[in-house]
């Protein structure tokens, strides 16, 4: 099945502590999760690695979030939207369901 949400899409979080926040998808994982810039930040306690000259400490990084908890953001309507698929000139393309506008 084709992916409805892909890398570099702007998404909006639907549920959880970051509900309503928007961000850009950095990575889509095969486990049905996505990593979004600035969303679901967690603190990781990292040990120093002297061989790589890396200091230790507490590092903030983005954790994965379920793809079902995000929706693609439609810039023309300013709201979250659903994604559909259709064929244009023999190619399968994604489109917004609310206004039938093709995505990128």
Swiss-Prot record:
GO cellular component: cytosol; ribonucleoprotein complex; ribosome
Matches recorded under InterPro entries: KOW, Rib_uL2_dom2, Ribosomal_uL24, Ribosomal_uL24_CS, Ribosomal_uL24_KOW, Translation_prot_SH3-like_sf
A GO biological process held by the record: translation
Keywords: Ribonucleoprotein, Ribosomal protein, RNA-binding, rRNA-binding
Pfam families: KOW, ribosomal_L24
NCBIfam families in UniProt: rplX_bact
Family of the protein in this entry: Belongs to the universal ribosomal protein uL24 family.
Function, in words: One of two assembly initiator proteins, it binds directly to the 5'-end of the 23S rRNA, where it nucleates assembly of the 50S subunit.
Subunit note: Part of the 50S ribosomal subunit.
PANTHER family noted in UniProt: MITOCHONDRIAL RIBOSOMAL PROTEIN L24
UniProt-recorded name of the protein: Large ribosomal subunit protein uL24
């Amino acid at each position: 099945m084709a992916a409805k949400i892909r890398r570099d899409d702007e998404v909006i979080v639907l549920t959880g502590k970051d509900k309503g926040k928007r961000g850009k998808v950095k990575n889509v994982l095969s486990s049905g999760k996505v990593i979004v810039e600035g969303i679901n930040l967690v603190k990781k306690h990292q040990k120093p690695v002297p061989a790589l000259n890396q200091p230790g400490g507490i590092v903030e990084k983005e954790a994965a979030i379920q793809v079902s908890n995000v929706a693609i953001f439609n810039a023309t309507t300013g709201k979250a939207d659903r994604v559909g698929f259709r064929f244009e000139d023999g190619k399968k393309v994604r489109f917004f369901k609310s206004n039938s506008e093709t995505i990128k």
